[in-house]
Amino acid sequence: MRFQVALLLLSVAVARALPSVYKRDADSGDSQNPPNQPSKQSSTPLPSSNQVKTTRPTDGQGQKSDKKDQDKTTLAAVSSKAESGPRTAATDHSLGDSRRQPEKTDAELNETARPLSPVNPKLEKSDQSSTEDSGKPTGGNSGKPTGGDSGKPTEAGSNKATEDDSGKSTKVDLDKPTSKISPDTETSKTDKVQPTEKGQKPTLTSKTESGETLAGDSDFSLKPEKGDKSSEPTEDVETKEIEEGDTEPEEGSPLEEENEKVPGPSSSENQEGTLTDSMKNEKDDLYKDSSGNTSAESSHFFAYLVTAAVLVAVLYIAYHNKRKIIAFALEGKRSKVTRRPKASDYQRLNLKL
């Protein structure tokens, strides 16, 4: 975070310092550039902002100003990369892809480079020195660094090819809603980022070199870049929506599986509930059995108590009334021995007399 904040502060300082430098360079360019240069540059087609590169004078002051401008542009590019954040990784990936382009594109770009090369050898030498100086911060963006004017068409051609490929691939991807996005589309998106980031550098140099004459052309080249920038987020949003739409069923399937799995825990909970209920019922049964046993035991115990109490009472009464009981038993025996004679017995005696 601290590094990014420092880069932002540097970019703000450079942005404030650039207008004054641009004015000075524009005045010096108007005074030193030959009158035929703007006509040549305006007559040549400008397909992209990367092709807008002008010749420079052979004086030492022009080269110093070029180096200063390039240093400032590199600082601005670094700040823009720091602000872009995660796009840097994608641009690095796209740069690696652009380095792997076939040799046919290099041959075609060299053929397109011939009409753009200047006629004067002095201007060629100055262009070579300027491109070699600029090749250090910006070289490697479009394959192997080439000195002289050959670096211009390679950058421009690579930008054209990447823009065409990106346009076709994004249209095809939008027409065909697929769940997986091919790496070509990713490279096309990153290739779109390239001209916008690369385009910032040559537009700044074109203003310093050609002055007022190329200001309109650079503005015109910036307009499609803005349009590309505005179209990029819309295409990115559409592709993101397609990706989300494609990933929704994929995400829904695990959700459905989770929903299917949810009855499992609920069923297990029900089983646990039934187990707990059965355990409770068993405990109740055991408690009832134990209570029944205790109640039976208690009932038997009370029966034993009652019988014991009755026996104690009988024994107590018998013990206290033993004399009466003995007398009653003995009287019965005595009565049997000494019983009274009956009337019949008396009648028999009288008859005998």
Curated annotation (Swiss-Prot):
Motif annotated as Endocytosis signal, chain positions: 346-349
Tissue specificity comment: Widely expressed.
Region (6 X 8 AA tandem repeats): 131-178
Bias (Polar residues): 29-57, 265-278
Signal peptide: 1-17
Glycosylation sites noted in the Swiss-Prot or TrEMBL record: 110, 293
Extent of Acidic residues compositional bias: 243-259
Extracellular side: 18-298
Top-level taxon: Eukaryota
GO cellular component: endosome; Golgi apparatus; plasma membrane; trans-Golgi network
Pfam families: KCT2
Alphabetic keyword roster: Cell membrane, Glycoprotein, Golgi apparatus, Membrane, Repeat, Signal, Transmembrane, Transmembrane helix
Further facts: Also found in strains BALB/c, C57BL/6 and DBA/2.
Function: May be involved in regulating membrane traffic to and from trans-Golgi network.
Descriptive protein name: Trans-Golgi network integral membrane protein 1
